[in-house]
Amino acid sequence: MQFGLILPIQAQGVDLDRLWQELRAETAAAEAAGFDAVFLTEFHQARGGALVSPMLLGAALLQGTDRIRFGTAVLAAPLHHPVRVAEDLLMLDWISRGRVILGLGIGHQRQDFAAFGVPHAERAEVFE
């Protein structure tokens, strides 16, 4: 059995520098406690703000760790070009020495789809 943690990315009322330090500390603590992975979600129009690039943030969080894996929980696939996702995943997998878990989904935040110009009603079709 393996265990992972979903890290909080919503920054409502929190200084972003402080949130970054907390995420780094939580990742280090998770690794020290024996957790297998940490996960980040993807929200672009979250109330109060959010950290919006889970793969980029995950790459930074893995620096300074040796064993723990990073995963997306989940990346809203219809909002991204599949080649870009594949390339970013390939690079992240390489620099992390194979410690990446890709979680994909159709997404659900209507405001995110509006911001990206992707019709919310077509998200399942775009995902396939």
Q: Where in the sequence are the language-model features?
A:
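Active-site nucleophile and cofactor-binding loops and adjacent substrate-binding regions
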Residues: 72-80
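A generic, residue-level signal for flexible/boundary positions that often mark functional hotspots
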Residues: 64, 69, 73, 107-110, ...
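Flexible, glycine-rich active-site loops centered on histidine and acidic residues
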Residues: 2-18, 79-128
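Structural motif
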Residues: 41, 73, 103-105
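N-terminal beta1-alpha1-beta2 module of alpha/beta enzyme domains
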Residues: 1-65, 69
